[in-house]
Protein backbone atom coordinates (compact mmCIF):
# COMPACT_ATOMS: atom_id res chain seq x y z
CA UNK A 1 0.00 0.00 0.00
CA UNK A 2 1.37 3.44 -0.95
CA UNK A 3 2.46 5.70 1.87
CA UNK A 4 1.66 8.84 -0.14
CA UNK A 5 -1.34 10.99 0.70
CA UNK A 6 -4.25 11.34 -1.77
CA UNK A 7 -3.06 14.90 -2.46
CA UNK A 8 0.43 13.67 -3.28
CA UNK A 9 -0.99 10.94 -5.51
CA UNK A 10 -3.10 13.48 -7.41
CA UNK A 11 -0.06 15.72 -7.86
CA UNK A 12 2.00 12.78 -9.11
CA UNK A 13 -0.75 11.77 -11.55
CA UNK A 14 -1.01 15.35 -12.86
CA UNK A 15 2.76 15.47 -13.26
CA UNK A 16 2.73 12.19 -15.20
CA UNK A 17 0.04 13.56 -17.50
CA UNK A 18 2.01 16.77 -18.05
CA UNK A 19 5.02 14.70 -19.07
CA UNK A 20 2.84 12.86 -21.59
CA UNK A 21 1.76 16.08 -23.30
CA UNK A 22 2.81 16.54 -26.90
CA UNK A 23 3.11 19.72 -28.96
CA UNK A 24 1.37 19.85 -32.30
CA UNK A 25 -0.22 22.02 -34.98
CA UNK A 26 -3.96 21.97 -35.70
CA UNK A 27 -4.19 21.28 -39.44
CA UNK A 28 -7.93 20.60 -39.83
CA UNK A 29 -11.16 21.35 -38.00
CA UNK A 30 -14.68 20.05 -38.40
CA UNK A 31 -17.11 20.77 -35.59
CA UNK A 32 -15.48 19.60 -32.34
CA UNK A 33 -13.11 17.30 -34.21
CA UNK A 34 -9.55 18.42 -34.87
CA UNK A 35 -6.63 16.90 -36.72
CA UNK A 36 -3.26 17.60 -35.13
CA UNK A 37 0.16 17.13 -36.72
CA UNK A 38 2.66 16.32 -33.93
CA UNK A 39 5.73 18.54 -33.76
CA UNK A 40 8.02 15.49 -34.01
CA UNK A 41 6.66 14.59 -37.46
CA UNK A 42 4.83 11.43 -36.39
CA UNK A 43 1.43 10.45 -37.82
CA UNK A 44 -1.48 12.89 -37.60
CA UNK A 45 -4.18 12.09 -35.07
CA UNK A 46 -7.72 13.11 -34.22
CA UNK A 47 -8.09 15.27 -31.12
CA UNK A 48 -11.01 16.59 -29.12
CA UNK A 49 -11.19 19.65 -26.87
CA UNK A 50 -11.32 19.24 -23.11
CA UNK A 51 -14.68 20.45 -21.85
CA UNK A 52 -17.78 21.56 -23.72
CA UNK A 53 -16.54 24.89 -25.08
CA UNK A 54 -14.17 24.78 -28.01
CA UNK A 55 -12.23 27.80 -29.24
CA UNK A 56 -9.56 25.91 -31.15
CA UNK A 57 -8.74 26.99 -34.70
CA UNK A 58 -6.70 25.66 -37.58
CA UNK A 59 -3.22 27.14 -37.27
CA UNK A 60 -3.18 26.90 -33.49
CA UNK A 61 -0.14 25.47 -31.74
CA UNK A 62 -1.50 23.16 -29.04
CA UNK A 63 -0.54 20.73 -26.30
CA UNK A 64 -2.43 17.45 -26.31
CA UNK A 65 -2.49 14.29 -24.23
CA UNK A 66 -2.60 11.08 -26.30
CA UNK A 67 -5.48 8.78 -25.32
CA UNK A 68 -4.69 6.10 -27.90
CA UNK A 69 -2.42 5.57 -30.90
CA UNK A 70 -4.55 7.83 -33.11
CA UNK A 71 -6.52 10.05 -30.72
CA UNK A 72 -5.87 12.67 -28.08
CA UNK A 73 -7.31 15.47 -25.96
CA UNK A 74 -6.25 19.08 -26.50
CA UNK A 75 -5.43 20.57 -23.11
CA UNK A 76 -3.81 23.89 -23.99
CA UNK A 77 -3.76 26.41 -26.85
CA UNK A 78 -0.50 28.27 -27.43
CA UNK A 79 -0.26 32.04 -27.61
CA UNK A 80 -1.78 33.43 -30.80
CA UNK A 81 -0.64 36.25 -33.02
CA UNK A 82 -4.19 36.69 -34.29
CA UNK A 83 -7.50 34.89 -34.81
CA UNK A 84 -9.73 35.52 -37.82
CA UNK A 85 -13.41 34.73 -37.48
CA UNK A 86 -16.85 35.85 -38.59
CA UNK A 87 -19.90 36.32 -36.41
CA UNK A 88 -23.59 37.09 -36.46
CA UNK A 89 -26.00 37.90 -33.62
CA UNK A 90 -25.95 34.35 -32.32
CA UNK A 91 -22.66 32.59 -32.99
CA UNK A 92 -19.10 32.85 -34.24
CA UNK A 93 -17.31 30.79 -36.88
CA UNK A 94 -13.54 30.52 -36.54
CA UNK A 95 -11.49 30.65 -39.72
CA UNK A 96 -7.86 30.27 -38.59
CA UNK A 97 -5.19 31.52 -36.21
CA UNK A 98 -1.61 32.80 -36.56
CA UNK A 99 -2.01 34.19 -40.07
CA UNK A 100 0.15 36.54 -42.10
CA UNK A 101 -2.19 37.30 -44.97
CA UNK A 102 -5.60 36.76 -46.50
CA UNK A 103 -6.04 35.60 -50.11
CA UNK A 104 -9.50 36.51 -51.44
CA UNK A 105 -10.38 34.58 -54.60
CA UNK A 106 -12.73 36.25 -57.09
CA UNK A 107 -13.52 35.46 -60.71
CA UNK A 108 -14.64 37.30 -63.82
CA UNK A 109 -17.62 34.95 -63.73
CA UNK A 110 -19.75 34.05 -61.89
CA UNK A 111 -20.44 37.54 -60.57
CA UNK A 112 -18.56 38.09 -57.30
CA UNK A 113 -20.01 39.86 -54.28
CA UNK A 114 -18.42 43.23 -53.53
CA UNK A 115 -20.11 43.13 -50.14
CA UNK A 116 -18.26 39.94 -49.20
CA UNK A 117 -15.03 41.35 -50.62
CA UNK A 118 -15.40 44.52 -48.57
CA UNK A 119 -16.12 42.57 -45.40
CA UNK A 120 -13.11 40.30 -45.93
CA UNK A 121 -10.90 43.37 -46.37
CA UNK A 122 -12.23 44.89 -43.14
CA UNK A 123 -11.51 41.62 -41.31
CA UNK A 124 -7.98 41.59 -42.72
CA UNK A 125 -7.34 45.20 -41.72
CA UNK A 126 -8.66 44.66 -38.19
CA UNK A 127 -6.34 41.66 -37.74
CA UNK A 128 -3.39 43.49 -39.35
CA UNK A 129 -3.21 40.91 -42.14
CA UNK A 130 -2.02 41.68 -45.64
CA UNK A 131 -4.95 41.20 -48.05
CA UNK A 132 -4.35 39.86 -51.55
CA UNK A 133 -7.16 39.89 -54.11
CA UNK A 134 -6.97 37.23 -56.83
CA UNK A 135 -9.03 37.77 -59.98
CA UNK A 136 -9.32 34.34 -61.60
CA UNK A 137 -10.65 33.34 -65.04
CA UNK A 138 -9.16 36.33 -66.87
CA UNK A 139 -9.34 34.20 -70.03
CA UNK A 140 -13.11 34.88 -70.04
CA UNK A 141 -12.47 38.01 -72.07
CA UNK A 142 -16.08 39.16 -72.36
CA UNK A 143 -16.39 39.45 -68.57
CA UNK A 144 -12.91 40.83 -67.87
CA UNK A 145 -13.48 44.60 -68.45
CA UNK A 146 -16.39 44.77 -66.00
CA UNK A 147 -14.51 42.76 -63.35
CA UNK A 148 -11.51 45.09 -63.68
CA UNK A 149 -13.75 48.14 -63.43
CA UNK A 150 -15.35 46.81 -60.24
CA UNK A 151 -11.91 46.21 -58.69
CA UNK A 152 -10.50 49.62 -59.63
CA UNK A 153 -11.76 51.09 -56.35
CA UNK A 154 -9.74 48.54 -54.36
CA UNK A 155 -6.60 49.05 -56.44
CA UNK A 156 -6.97 52.75 -55.71
CA UNK A 157 -6.99 51.99 -51.98
CA UNK A 158 -3.65 50.25 -52.36
CA UNK A 159 -4.81 46.64 -52.32
CA UNK A 160 -2.86 44.16 -54.45
CA UNK A 161 -4.92 42.56 -57.25
CA UNK A 162 -3.38 39.51 -58.94
CA UNK A 163 -4.87 38.55 -62.31
CA UNK A 164 -4.61 34.85 -63.20
CA UNK A 165 -6.17 32.10 -65.27
CA UNK A 166 -5.63 29.02 -63.14
CA UNK A 167 -7.01 26.59 -65.73
CA UNK A 168 -6.02 28.47 -68.88
CA UNK A 169 -2.46 29.42 -67.87
CA UNK A 170 -1.57 27.25 -64.86
CA UNK A 171 2.21 27.76 -64.99
CA UNK A 172 1.92 31.55 -65.06
CA UNK A 173 -0.71 31.45 -62.31
CA UNK A 174 1.50 29.25 -60.12
CA UNK A 175 4.49 31.58 -60.53
CA UNK A 176 2.39 34.65 -59.70
CA UNK A 177 0.81 33.10 -56.62
CA UNK A 178 3.94 31.45 -55.22
CA UNK A 179 5.80 34.77 -55.33
CA UNK A 180 3.27 36.17 -52.85
CA UNK A 181 2.61 33.05 -50.75
CA UNK A 182 6.01 31.50 -50.06
CA UNK A 183 7.13 31.96 -46.48
CA UNK A 184 3.72 33.14 -45.26
CA UNK A 185 0.72 31.59 -43.54
CA UNK A 186 -2.19 32.47 -45.82
CA UNK A 187 -5.92 31.93 -45.40
CA UNK A 188 -7.83 31.30 -48.62
CA UNK A 189 -11.33 32.80 -48.77
CA UNK A 190 -13.87 32.84 -51.55
CA UNK A 191 -17.42 32.16 -52.62
CA UNK A 192 -18.22 28.87 -54.28
CA UNK A 193 -17.48 28.83 -58.00
CA UNK A 194 -14.56 31.26 -57.96
CA UNK A 195 -11.89 28.58 -58.51
CA UNK A 196 -10.66 28.19 -54.96
CA UNK A 197 -10.37 24.39 -55.13
CA UNK A 198 -8.59 24.61 -58.49
CA UNK A 199 -6.12 27.03 -56.94
CA UNK A 200 -5.41 24.64 -54.06
CA UNK A 201 -4.84 21.74 -56.45
CA UNK A 202 -2.49 23.90 -58.52
CA UNK A 203 -0.31 24.84 -55.55
CA UNK A 204 -0.61 21.64 -53.50
CA UNK A 205 -0.04 18.65 -55.84
CA UNK A 206 -1.13 16.06 -53.24
CA UNK A 207 -4.10 18.07 -51.92
CA UNK A 208 -6.64 15.38 -52.79
CA UNK A 209 -4.58 12.69 -51.06
CA UNK A 210 -4.25 14.90 -47.98
CA UNK A 211 -7.99 15.58 -48.02
CA UNK A 212 -8.77 11.86 -48.09
CA UNK A 213 -6.35 11.24 -45.22
CA UNK A 214 -7.97 13.96 -43.12
CA UNK A 215 -11.49 12.82 -44.06
CA UNK A 216 -10.60 9.32 -42.90
CA UNK A 217 -9.14 10.63 -39.65
CA UNK A 218 -12.28 12.70 -39.06
CA UNK A 219 -14.47 9.73 -39.97
CA UNK A 220 -16.42 12.13 -42.16
CA UNK A 221 -16.39 9.99 -45.28
CA UNK A 222 -16.58 13.17 -47.35
CA UNK A 223 -13.91 14.36 -49.73
CA UNK A 224 -15.28 17.84 -50.32
CA UNK A 225 -14.23 21.05 -48.60
CA UNK A 226 -16.55 20.64 -45.62
CA UNK A 227 -13.77 21.40 -43.16
CA UNK A 228 -11.01 23.97 -42.84
CA UNK A 229 -7.56 22.50 -43.43
CA UNK A 230 -3.93 23.59 -43.58
CA UNK A 231 -1.49 22.53 -46.29
CA UNK A 232 2.26 23.14 -46.02
CA UNK A 233 3.42 24.85 -49.21
CA UNK A 234 5.92 22.62 -51.07
CA UNK A 235 9.48 23.95 -50.90
CA UNK A 236 8.50 26.79 -48.60
CA UNK A 237 8.12 27.56 -44.92
CA UNK A 238 4.65 28.86 -45.73
CA UNK A 239 1.22 27.30 -45.42
CA UNK A 240 -2.08 27.61 -47.26
CA UNK A 241 -5.27 27.29 -45.21
CA UNK A 242 -8.40 26.45 -47.19
CA UNK A 243 -11.83 27.15 -45.72
CA UNK A 244 -15.28 26.07 -46.95
CA UNK A 245 -17.02 28.42 -49.37
CA UNK A 246 -19.46 30.80 -47.71
CA UNK A 247 -22.13 33.30 -48.65
CA UNK A 248 -22.13 35.54 -45.55
CA UNK A 249 -19.40 37.32 -43.61
CA UNK A 250 -20.78 38.84 -40.43
CA UNK A 251 -18.53 41.09 -38.37
CA UNK A 252 -20.89 41.70 -35.48
CA UNK A 253 -18.02 41.38 -32.98
CA UNK A 254 -16.22 44.50 -34.21
CA UNK A 255 -16.87 47.65 -32.22
CA UNK A 256 -17.44 51.00 -33.90
CA UNK A 257 -13.94 52.12 -32.92
CA UNK A 258 -12.38 49.08 -34.57
CA UNK A 259 -14.53 49.43 -37.67
CA UNK A 260 -13.58 53.04 -38.40
CA UNK A 261 -9.88 52.12 -38.28
CA UNK A 262 -10.42 49.09 -40.55
CA UNK A 263 -11.16 51.40 -43.51
CA UNK A 264 -7.72 52.71 -44.57
CA UNK A 265 -9.21 55.71 -46.39
CA UNK A 266 -10.88 56.82 -43.14
CA UNK A 267 -7.75 56.82 -40.97
CA UNK A 268 -6.09 60.09 -42.09
CA UNK A 269 -9.37 61.96 -41.48
CA UNK A 270 -10.46 60.59 -38.10
CA UNK A 271 -8.74 63.36 -36.11
CA UNK A 272 -10.39 66.06 -38.25
CA UNK A 273 -14.00 65.42 -37.18
CA UNK A 274 -15.54 68.22 -35.09
CA UNK A 275 -16.58 65.81 -32.34
CA UNK A 276 -14.13 63.33 -30.80
CA UNK A 277 -16.90 60.71 -30.53
CA UNK A 278 -18.17 61.19 -34.09
CA UNK A 279 -19.96 58.14 -35.53
CA UNK A 280 -19.38 59.25 -39.15
CA UNK A 281 -23.04 58.66 -39.98
CA UNK A 282 -24.86 62.03 -39.83
CA UNK A 283 -22.91 64.29 -37.47
CA UNK A 284 -22.15 67.92 -38.44
CA UNK A 285 -18.50 68.65 -39.08
CA UNK A 286 -17.68 65.01 -39.87
CA UNK A 287 -14.54 64.82 -42.00
CA UNK A 288 -15.51 61.37 -43.28
CA UNK A 289 -18.91 62.55 -44.53
CA UNK A 290 -17.29 65.57 -46.17
CA UNK A 291 -14.89 63.23 -47.99
CA UNK A 292 -17.83 61.09 -49.15
CA UNK A 293 -19.63 64.20 -50.42
CA UNK A 294 -16.67 65.42 -52.48
CA UNK A 295 -15.73 61.98 -53.82
CA UNK A 296 -12.53 61.33 -51.87
CA UNK A 297 -14.22 58.35 -50.19
CA UNK A 298 -16.44 56.07 -52.29
CA UNK A 299 -20.11 56.10 -51.33
CA UNK A 300 -20.27 52.30 -51.41
CA UNK A 301 -17.40 52.05 -48.92
CA UNK A 302 -19.15 54.39 -46.51
CA UNK A 303 -22.39 52.44 -47.01
CA UNK A 304 -20.55 49.25 -45.99
CA UNK A 305 -19.19 51.00 -42.90
CA UNK A 306 -22.69 52.18 -41.95
CA UNK A 307 -24.10 48.68 -42.43
CA UNK A 308 -21.37 47.12 -40.28
CA UNK A 309 -21.94 49.69 -37.52
CA UNK A 310 -25.65 48.87 -37.60
CA UNK A 311 -24.96 45.13 -37.37
CA UNK A 312 -22.54 45.62 -34.49
CA UNK A 313 -25.16 47.65 -32.61
CA UNK A 314 -27.45 44.59 -32.55
CA UNK A 315 -25.06 42.73 -30.23
CA UNK A 316 -25.51 42.94 -26.48
CA UNK A 317 -21.97 43.40 -25.17
From Swiss-Prot:
Q: Does the keyword GTP-binding apply?
A: yes
Q: Which gene encodes it?
A: rsgA
Question: Keywords on this record?
Answer: Cytoplasm, GTP-binding, Hydrolase, Metal-binding, Nucleotide-binding, Ribosome biogenesis, RNA-binding, rRNA-binding, Zinc
Cofactor dependency: Zn(2+)
Q: What is this protein called?
A: Small ribosomal subunit biogenesis GTPase RsgA
- Recorded family membership: Belongs to the TRAFAC class YlqF/YawG GTPase family. RsgA subfamily.
Q: Pfam families in the record, alphabetically?
A: RsgA_GTPase (PF03193)
Residues noted as binding GTP in the record, renumbered to the chain: 136-139, 190-198
HAMAP family, per this entry?
A: GTPase_RsgA
This enzyme's EC code(s): 3.6.1.-
GO cellular component terms, semicolon-separated: cytoplasm
Q: Which organism is it from?
A: Paraburkholderia phymatum (strain DSM 17167 / CIP 108236 / LMG 21445 / STM815)
Q: Which GO terms describe its molecular function?
A: GTP binding; GTPase activity; metal ion binding; rRNA binding
Q: Where is each CP-type G domain found?
A: 88-249
Amino acid sequence: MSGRSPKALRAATANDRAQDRVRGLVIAAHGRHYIVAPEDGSAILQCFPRGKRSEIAVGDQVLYEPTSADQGVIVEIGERRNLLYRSDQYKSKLFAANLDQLLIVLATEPHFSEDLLGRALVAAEENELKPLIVLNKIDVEAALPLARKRLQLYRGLGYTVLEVSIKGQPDAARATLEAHLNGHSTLLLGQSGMGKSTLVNLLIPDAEVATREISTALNSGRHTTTFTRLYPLPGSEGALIDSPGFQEFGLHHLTEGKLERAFPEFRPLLAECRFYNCHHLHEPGCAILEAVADGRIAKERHALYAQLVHEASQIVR
